[in-house]
Amino acid sequence: MKVNKWTLGLATLGLVSLPGTGLAEEKMNQMWTALSSTTISGYVNTSIHWNTGTGNGHTPAFSYNGSSKQDGFNLNAVKLAIEKPLDEAQWAAGYKAELLFGPDAVSYLTTLDGNTLTGGDSSAAAIKQAYVALRAPIGNGLDFKLGVFDTIVGYEVFDGGNNPNYTRSYGFTIEPTTHTGLLGTYQLCKAASVSAGIANTHGPFINQKADAGGLMAESYKTYMGSLALTAPDDWGSFAGSTAYFGVVNGLNTVNAGPAIQTS
């Protein structure tokens, strides 16, 4: 592109823009606009365990509380999350990816190399969530998650800082943690929302397909649903509190019977 000295001088002063420069700036602005709505977060989870006596080899069968953590200092997990949340538009799209690293990532059973508690290394990486988020302009807005997402039942979660206690209950130990499938959520009103979904299995293995053995069917899927009720602002100390009711029903592993979880 040929540019005379007069145009070049005006461009230097910022009074005009060169065609190529304007196009490049437009592309950069589009890129920064896309990145401005993307968030990166995470945490490092460490612990100190000390049990009196010599019973460290027979600890209660709670998740992430094995004998290898007793009487010492531990790195539990490192989490890295990248998310572009849905905006307020009627049609919206986003995504979320959460990766886990460290010993607790092995116990989550979604390691990238396929290793689990038997044969997995203590520095493994695992996928906690990885889904595409979509919104359709139906009523108040119907939101979808397609991919790997957290289960809809249970009071406790993997992220230790979000639990009321450091140790998790036996209920968390037997509950599903993650599913690979499609989940839809609809906000009925300010005080109530419902969710319904379908997944490959009861979880947690990513992309695993269920097989019920002798039952005659092309494929078997896991079904789930939940209802969330939020207390209104005039309920005093209970204002903003939420009660969840949910059920997950489906096959867990190959040739296994159905598993039903409610909360």
Predicted segment positions?
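Bacterial N-terminal signal peptides that target proteins for export
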Residues: M1-G9
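Active-site cleft segment of glycoside hydrolase catalytic domains centered on the general acid/base Glu
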Residues: K209-M216
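A generic structural signal for short coil/turn motifs at secondary-structure boundaries
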Residues: V106, F205-N207, V254-A256
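Sec/Tat signal peptide C-region and signal peptidase I cleavage site
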Residues: L18-A24
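Detector for outer-membrane/organellar transmembrane beta-barrel domains
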Residues: E218-Y220, G225-S263
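Bacterial N-terminal signal peptides
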Residues: G9-S17
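Outer membrane beta-barrel
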Residues: E26-P204, S219-K221, A228-S237
